[in-house]
Amino acid sequence: MSDIALTVSILALVAVVGLFIGNVKFRGIGLGIGGVLFGGIIVGHFVSQAGMTLSSDMLHVIQEFGLILFVYTIGIQVGPGFFASLRVSGLRLNLFAVLIVIIGGLVTAILHKLFDIPLPVVLGIFSGAVTNTPALGAGQQILRDLGTPMEMVDQMGMSYAMAYPFGICGILFTMWMLRVIFRVNVETEAQQHESSRTNGGALIKTINIRVENPNLHDLAIKDVPILNGDKIICSRLKREETLKVPSPDTIIQLGDLLHLVGQPADLHNAQLVIGQEVDTSLSTKDTDLRVERVVVTNENVLGKRIRDLHFKERYDVVISRLNRAGVELVASGDISLQFGDILNLVGRPSAIDAVANVLGNAQQKLQQVQMLPVFIGIGLGVLLGSIPVFVPGFPAALKLGLAGGLLIMALILGRIGSIGKLYWFMPPSANLALRELGIVLFLSVVGLKSGGDFVNTLVNGEGLSWIGYGALITAVPLITVGILARMLAKMNYLTMCGMLAGSMTDPPALAFANNLHPTSGAAALSYATVYPLVMFLRIITPQLLAVLFWSIG
């Protein structure tokens, strides 16, 4: 058997063994995709004992290609929500998550200096302790750029594997410990979270209001500032027994009922100006109007603002709200459409069908992947990561590297959505498939390279010390920030658990947090809020630590 055939066969075996290990769960908790790393270590140990020779060049290419696929698809997935997560609504959660990353970096730096841990080893421990595989790839990339010998770079994968198990268990232990310390009643926390969402959350809501302000009588909707802005959409108007879709030129009269869509605070302001909320239904049932959700798939409307499409004027159809990457938004006129946006339309059936034709609404296109934008994005990301930045006093030019360059480019492209007829939307199933393939390839090679010396390092070397260092890097930031968030910020426990899981980009921890109260979405919401920014920081941090430690010797 040729070296290439043998290498591919061994990688396939690693994937099978690793995925099997990852699917084994104890009380609902398993290693998940991280099991591939340990599958690689097991197979790598026996490959080394048998004296088999694998193609090192091929292993290197597969490892890098796997990292490229994984990081790029993560960036495309979280791109639409990344910049939104930096806004005020998620600012507090992101600040605490960033603090966890910073404290973890400081603990790593202190351990490196106190115990004189080799740079590749301490970076591997850091990456494993925070259960972040892209950080491992980014760290190995920067070490190679700094001229570190390959045998030293491979040690990073071994130390990563030592620290990884407690990285998963440590966050679960932290959640349990915080629950005990603060005597948390999970049911009460879930009720409080639901109450805060209902009363003050930045969710999109609807209300029906009666026009009671005499100053608004006989005014066109476009002449009422609060109805002509970008924060509230008036999608239906009922006068006596007639329900219709209002246009900007529609005249409102005293006693009219308006169906408004917006955030709670803005709707409250509308009540102060227009009139009181009423219980009267403005349902389209048994009327000539209907409400329908339509998906944007037509390349000709991508990048165009809603107001420039003139749906109200041409078709008498109102877009009441927009769902982008799972986030509900008010469909203001200045929003530019992206591929995959889901629009809530209100109008007559024939008019809605006409608008749907303009927007595309081709469900099958959501299952198709445009490969040209994928490779354009990967190429641009690699180029961005290769741009050197020379800083006086540093031993090597700073680069974002494969991981950093691809992540930033994918975040930007995911946020832009489309350029002309090129769109960077990727169906969730396709994104997940490429992401899983990439991480399996990457971890398989890392495990294989680490497996030869893993057992000896654990039994006769410093493996146990590495596990202890990793436990500190995992536990200290989580416990510190968890206590601060609960005591100072009075953060909801379920929200805090989601934030802690997101700060470690740890899906098993999110599964554990969700199971604390299966019907509450608090943990998932906070996890999604901090995940994009934290993923970016986790990939950048080992590169910054590597350059810093290298420069100060």
UniProtKB/Swiss-Prot annotation:
Lipid bilayer topology: Multi-pass membrane protein
Could you list this entry's UniProt keywords, alphabetically sorted.
Cell membrane, Membrane, Repeat, Transmembrane, Transmembrane helix, Transport
Q: What parts of the sequence cross the membrane?
A: 4-24, 28-48, 65-85, 95-115, 158-178, 371-391, 393-413, 431-448, 464-484, 493-513, 533-553
* GO-annotated cellular components: plasma membrane
Domain (RCK C-terminal) spans 191-276, 279-361
The superkingdom listed in its UniProt entry is Bacteria
Q: Name one GO molecular function term.
A: monoatomic cation transmembrane transporter activity
The UniProt record lists the keyword Transport: yes
One BP annotation, GO: potassium ion transport
Give the residue range of the signal peptide: none
Q: Does the keyword Secreted apply?
A: no
Q: Where does the protein end up?
A: Cell membrane
Query: What does the similarity note say?
Result: Belongs to the AAE transporter (TC 2.A.81) family. YidE subfamily.
Q: Which NCBIfam families match?
A: PRK03818.1, YidE_YbjL_dupl
The name on file for this protein is Putative transport protein YidE
Q: Which gene encodes it?
A: yidE
